[in-house]
Regions:
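Buried, small/hydrophobic-residue-enriched core segments of structured protein domains
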Residues: 1-143, 155-160
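Gly/Ser/Thr/Ala-enriched C-terminal appendages of enzymes
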Residues: 124-145, 153-270
Length: 270
C-alpha cells in the first residue's frame, strides 16, 4: 500500500524504485518485481531488471563526483563513457548550490535531466529549491531538462513537489522499509464448530471484493453479498493458485499484472 499511495499522488510522472539498497540482496529481485507490478515505471537493480526483462534505470551516483573531484569533470566523464541509450541525468547537489550545478551540467553536456537528492538537513524547503532550479533552467534556455527528485520521499512529500515542477521521482525507503502489516494465523473452527481466543472472531470466513468500487467484505455466509456502496454482486477475493504443490493457474507477465494494478488504482480511493 505504501507504493500505491506514492503512485497515486505522483500521477503520471515517472517513478523509479530505488529501494533495493535498503533490503537484503537475496530479496532484491523480488522487491524490484513487486515495485514494478505495483506501479513503478522502472527498477534500479541489475538482477531485478533482468528478471523483468527490462533495462535497469537510475542516474549517476554522488560517488562518481566525489572520486573525480569536480562536478563538471564528472558530468563530462559520465557522458563520454555511457552508451547513447542511457539518459543523461546527473546529480546537481554535491558541493554547490543546486541551481549552480544544474546550470553547469546543462552547459557542459547534452543533458536530459538533473537529480536532486539533497539531504533533509540542508534542504530548507525542498519544493522551493525545485522551483528555483526550474526557473533558472528555463531562464537560460534549458526548458527540456527535467528535474528528478529522491531522498526520503513518500506520499506526503511528493504532492508539493509535483506542484513545484518535478519531472519524476526515485522512491526507496518508503517502499522497501514500509511498516509491516500486523496479522496472525489463528484457529477459528474445530470440527465444524466456531472457536476463537478472546479478541478474535470465530468461524470459517469468506472474503469478497467488488469489481467496480474495489471494496472488501468478510462474511461467514456462503451467499455472495452485494456491495454496500454500489450494489453490484461481489466476487470471491480468494483464488486457489496451487494444489498438491503445483500451480494451477497460468503465469501472467509482469506487464499484464502492472496494467491491471494501475487500472484498479485509477478507480481506488486511498
Amino acid at each position: 500500500m505504501a507504493l500505491e499511495r506514492c503512485r497515486k499522488v505522483a500521477g503520471n510522472l515517472p517513478m523509479i524504485a530505488f529501494g533495493v539498497r535498503r533490503a537484503h540482496p537475496a530479496i532484491a529481485p523480488m522487491l524490484d518485481r513487486s515495485s514494478y507490478i505495483g506501479g513503478c515505471n522502472g527498477v534500479s537493480s541489475i538482477l531485478g531488471a533482468e528478471m523483468l526483462g527490462r533495462p535497469a534505470e537510475g542516474t549517476m551516483p554522488h560517488a562518481l563526483i566525489l572520486m573525480v573531484g569536480e562536478p563538471v569533470d564528472a558530468f563530462r566523464a559520465f557522458d563520454e563513457v555511457m552508451g547513447p541509450e542511457v539518459p543523461r541525468i546527473v546529480l546537481a547537489d554535491t558541493y554547490s548550490d543546486e541551481k549552480v550545478e544544474a546550470l553547469a551540467a546543462a552547459d557542459a553536456i547534452d543533458l536530459d535531466g538533473v537529480r536532486l537528492d539533497t539531504p533533509s538537513s540542508r534542504r530548507g524547503s525542498f519544493p522551493d529549491i525545485v522551483r528555483e532550479v526550474r526557473w533558472e533552467l528555463d531562464l537560460h534556455g534549458h526548458r527540456d531538462v527535467g528535474i528528478i527528485l529522491s531522498g526520503g520521499l513518500d506520499e506526503t512529500t511528493i504532492p508539493p513537489l509535483v506542484q513545484a515542477g518535478a519531472s519524476g521521482f526515485g522512491v526507496g525507503s518508503s517502499i522497501s522499509s514500509a511498516p509491516g502489516i500486523d496479522f496472525a494465523l489463528d484457529i477459528v473452527e474445530r470440527d465444524g464448530t466456531p472457536v476463537a481466543k478472546k479478541g478474535k472472531y470465530g468461524g470459517r470466513k469468506r472474503s469478497y471484493r467488488c469489481p467496480d468500487c474495489l471494496g472488501f467484505e468478510v462474511s461467514v455466509s456462503e451467499k455472495v453479498p452485494a456491495c454496500r456502496d454500489c450494489g453490484r454482486e461481489m466476487m470471491p477475493a480468494e483464488v486457489k493458485l496451487m494444489e498438491h504443490g503445483k500451480r494451477i493457474v497460468p503465469t501472467e507477465a509482469p506487464e499484464a499484472i502492472r496494467k491491471r494494478v494501475l487500472e484498479q488504482l485509477s478507480r481506488a480511493v486511498i
